[in-house]
Amino acid sequence: MPPHPPFCVLMAGLPGSGKTTLSRALTARGFIRLCPDEEMFRRHGVYGVDFPRGVFPTLERPVLEDVAADLREQLKAGHDVVVDHGFWTPEDRAKWRAIATDAGATPVLVYLAASHDELWARISKRNEFHANDPNSIYFSESDLQRYRTRFIPPQPDEPHLLYEGDSAAVIATLESFSA
């Protein structure tokens, strides 16, 4: 068991903002990584190919419930966990912070801010891998623009770390919390 209550790292970010990159850096430091997109791919296949795009929220709901149950178990077992998911709204983030707190963990929200051009460059590059990579769900630029209108970045009253592409800085901050 870690010398501190386990961390639960939650991320707020749009597709292409670096969530998977950061979560993989945390797994290299011993974090358990939970990824709803990978579970969606495992259960249902390729987004927009094996199931219609419009049913994603309906199919995702039970996946998120199962990921939340797994999160509770991992945190109660004393493991540090990172949830590789976008958490687009304050309400969604509050719900998952409560799951972490109820399991005895310290929730840490990381905001992955990025410009439209940066997001679109990353998404368009990884779109070619969407058929075989659960972390490369195909999105058009108009999808990204629509998603941006639904994404609510953390505000000053919602404690968070700002990720600017430096995983080591996030790791150092987490280590300072447990010192």
Annotate each PLM feature.
Residues 38-40, 113-119, 167-168:
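Conserved nucleotide-binding/hydrolysis micro-motifs of P-loop NTPases
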Residues 11:
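Hydrophobic anchor at the beta1->P-loop junction of P-loop NTPases
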Residues 1-5, 74:
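Phosphate-binding P-loop
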Residues 31-33, 107-109, 158-162:
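Conserved beta-strand scaffold positions in the cores of enzyme catalytic domains, especially
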Residues 131-179:
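Small-molecule kinase domains that catalyze NTP-dependent phosphoryl transfer to phosphate-bearing small molecules
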Residues 101-152:
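A glycine- and Lys/Arg-enriched "phosphate-lid" helix/loop adjacent to the NTP-binding pocket
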Residues 58-107:
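Glycine-rich phosphate-binding loop used to anchor ATP phosphates in small-molecule kinases
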Residues 17-79:
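Conserved substrate/cofactor phosphate-moiety recognition/catalytic segment
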